[in-house]
């Protein structure tokens, strides 16, 4: 089957659609920027009632590659409301509201997008925005991707058994969603309302 926008979205973001993760990210290649904009707008129209949003975080018209972010606004807001996450993001250069105020997810994603587009170094704190445990994100940064205890959907630096169990759950979800999608179940039916 052709790896069109929808296929790649299922491959990379099934756990987000199933409400097992707050967010997912995939690379999409197209020479037709207008078509990509239409697809993002169309999917937002369809998925917003289920609590999902689609956004292009980074795009390059020279190589026609785009990073598309699919997320559950309420789950991302919960991640960003965590004081430890906020402290970590402040240390990574993010502007957040005063203590006690909830950060605006859209504003935080705009800051992440700027870092993706303008920073010389890849912003590994993106793991927080993808719902990876803070300890794993910090562990990855401090260890430069080495010395992990388990590797699956991301590199884990905590309990390897718990991490593997979680990775297995996410992989099973993706396999089931791909099977259903390839059997004709539309994405809108696969997306769980939150």
Locations of the language-model features?
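Hydrophobic/aromatic-rich, well-ordered segments within soluble, folded domains that form packed cores
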Residues: 122-150
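Non-catalytic, substrate/partner-engaging modules appended to enzymatic cores
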Residues: 96-97, 117, 138, 150-165
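Internal catalytic-core helix/loop-beta-alpha segment
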Residues: 93-124
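A glycine-rich, hydrophobic loop/mini-helix early in the fold
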Residues: 39-101
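Long, compositionally biased
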Residues: 153-194
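A structured, charge-rich N-terminal accessory region that forms the first stable segment of a protein
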Residues: 1-50, 54
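Short linear loop/turn motifs
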Residues: 103-107, 141-144, 151-158
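Short, surface-exposed beta-edge/turn micro-motifs
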Residues: 21-23, 64-66, 123-125
């Amino acid at each position: 089957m052709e790896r069109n926008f929808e296929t790649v979205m299922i491959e990379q973001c099934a756990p987000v659609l199933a409400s097992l993760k707050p967010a997912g990210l995939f690379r999409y290649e197209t020479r037709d920027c207008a078509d990509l904009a239409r697809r993002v707008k169309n999917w937002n129209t369809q998925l917003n009632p289920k609590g999902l949003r689609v956004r292009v975080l980074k795009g390059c018209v020279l190589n026609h590659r785009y990073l598309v972010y699919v997320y559950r606004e309420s789950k991302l807001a919960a991640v960003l409301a965590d004081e430890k996450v906020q402290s970590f993001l402040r240390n990574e250069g993010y502007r957040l509201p005063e203590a006690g105020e909830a950060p605006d997810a859209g504003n935080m994603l705009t800051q992440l997008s700027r870092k993706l587009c303008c920073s010389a170094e890849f912003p590994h704190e993106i793991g927080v925005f993808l719902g990876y445990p803070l300890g794993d994100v910090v562990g990855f940064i401090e260890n430069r991707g080495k010395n992990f205890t388990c590797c699956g959907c991301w590199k884990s630096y905590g309990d390897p058994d718990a991490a593997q169990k979680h990775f297995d759950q996410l992989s099973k979800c993706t396999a089931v969603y791909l099977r259903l999608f390839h059997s004709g179940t539309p994405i809108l039916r696969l997306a769980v309302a939150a």
